[in-house]
Amino acid sequence: MIQPDNEESWYAFKIFFGKGKPIKAYFVAKGIEHIYDVKQEYWDKNKKKSLLKEVPIMPSLILFRTTRTEAEEIERNFLNKVMLYRGKNSENLKEPSKISEREVKIFNIVATSGVEGLDFYDEYNPKFTKGDKFRVIEGPLKGAEGYVVRIKKDHKLYVSIKGLCAVTTGYIPKAYLQKIE
């Protein structure tokens, strides 16, 4: 089913070679809602002096809300700098992958929480979406939903945007988790 061109949805760009700043500036100038957050990090190149540097939380991904037509136009404007994520539709044709509002909201809770121990994955891994689903009911990640998985001998909450990317948290106390039936 092809969606109407004037309907706004969430889409994602894969960003090449650290070209996130000009794309973010474009979105800000055009007033396009987007998610491309940065964190402050101390960077010590030669162990002589450290610099405070802005580092993207998700260096190769920017989420944005716009129409399908505008998303494809932005991709053409930033040729060789970004790639619009695409999936196959019911007619087996590739079209821009629409991301649900709920997935973006939950992913954003975790990605922008500022908690330590977040790991980002450029690829969605369906093997981590088996088992019981949980909701975080307390703490800085309150409202996040995902699967508790074991990675490198640690239990982590795995939150994903299906078919696109994922983030895992550090340790979350069991008292903060509620099983979703």
Which residue stretches match the model-derived regions?
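Short coil-to-beta-strand transition motifs
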Residues: 128, 137-144
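Acidic-enriched and Gly/Ser
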Residues: 1-133, 155-158, 163-178
